[in-house]
């Protein structure tokens, strides 16, 4: 499906936000399932429900509050999405990624994406954090791409490169920050693969995804990253490994959404510290003299 939004629609939303807040965010953070508590660390927070904001879709998933929160975190002006949008909710990819282009028009230069994911890599344990080094856009293999349709050069080029989608420098800084934290949880690095959902993957699908080189699997993030890179944003992402994907027919365990939320709660304090420390490594924009 082609983009149902015009450039003016994005502008309308951005202008509305700029008129209703004095914040001019440098960083946007998209909080995944069970990770919305990150917003509690924003100082002098200003909150907008999605239903207040022109053109904004509504979040329908448990663990996604559906709020846009502006504030300060470690000296960085931020906007955080407390709840994202998914294909499985019935949204087109242009709606799933709508906020990213709005963030670009607000002046955001760095996008931080977080998600809950199932571990495909046998070396991953529940509770590990995986820095996203690369992704596999499986819906894209079937023509589902957020950039499909006429290109608007005001956002970016027709054929954007994705070989460097996730910022290497920020990943290196993340490893340094993790060592400083002295955490017992493991910080991993790997490839994230996106499925459309909402059902969890079959054993055969899980085995195929592992053969493709994926380390973790989820139902989000990739469309947002594609649009962010199209807009020229720096991207940093990580996955919280909330379950080990079942790849054996003799294994009677079944993935479920509650374990995703529970893992998010258990890791909340660690992730909040992690993101807060990382903010210090994000370069401030050059506003000129």
Swiss-Prot record:
The cellular location(s) given in this protein's UniProt record come to: Cytoplasm
- Provide the binding site for a purine D-ribonucleoside: 88, 201, 219, 243, 257
Q: What is its main location?
A: cytoplasm
Superkingdom in the source lineage = Eukaryota
Please describe, based on the UniProt annotation, the reported consequence of changing residue 258 to K: In haplotype NPC
Positions carrying N-acetylmethionine are 1
Q: What biological-process terms (Gene Ontology) are attached?
A: adenosine catabolic process; allantoin metabolic process; alpha-beta T cell differentiation; amide catabolic process; AMP catabolic process; AMP salvage; apoptotic mitochondrial changes; B cell differentiation
At which residues is there a site annotated Important for substrate specificity? 243
Keyword Transferase included in the entry's annotation: yes
Which reaction(s) are listed as its catalytic activity? inosine + phosphate = alpha-D-ribose 1-phosphate + hypoxanthine; guanosine + phosphate = alpha-D-ribose 1-phosphate + guanine; 2'-deoxyguanosine + phosphate = 2-deoxy-alpha-D-ribose 1-phosphate + guanine; 2'-deoxyinosine + phosphate = 2-deoxy-alpha-D-ribose 1-phosphate + hypoxanthine
For this UniProt record, the keywords arranged alphabetically read as follows: Acetylation, Cytoplasm, Glycosyltransferase, Purine salvage, Transferase
Question: What is this enzyme's EC?
Answer: 2.4.2.1
Q: In which pathway does it act?
A: Purine metabolism; purine nucleoside salvage
Record-level Gene Ontology MF annotations = guanosine phosphorylase activity; purine-nucleoside phosphorylase activity
Phenotype of the disrupted gene, per the record: At 10-week old, mice have a smaller cerebellum, corpus callosum and thalamus and motor abnormalities. Normal number of Purkinje cells in the cerebellum at birth but numbers start to decrease as mice get older. Purkinje cells in the cerebellum have an irregular shape, a granular cytoplasm and degenerated dendrites characterized by fewer dendritic spines processes. Loss of inosine phosphorylase activity in cerebellum, liver and kidney.
**Which positions bind phosphate?**
33, 64, 84-86, 116, 220
Q: Name the GO cellular-component terms.
A: cytosol
Q: Which residues cross the membrane?
A: none
Spell out the family assignment given in the record's similarity comment.
Belongs to the PNP/MTAP phosphorylase family.
**Subunit and interaction comment:** Homotrimer.
> What is the recorded function of this protein according to its Swiss-Prot or TrEMBL entry?
Catalyzes the phosphorolytic breakdown of the N-glycosidic bond in the beta-(deoxy)ribonucleoside molecules, with the formation of the corresponding free purine bases and pentose-1-phosphate. Preferentially acts on 6-oxopurine nucleosides including inosine and guanosine.
NCBIfam families the UniProt entry points to: PNPH, PNPH-PUNA-XAPA, PRK08202.1
Name of this chain's protein:
Purine nucleoside phosphorylase
The gene is: Pnp
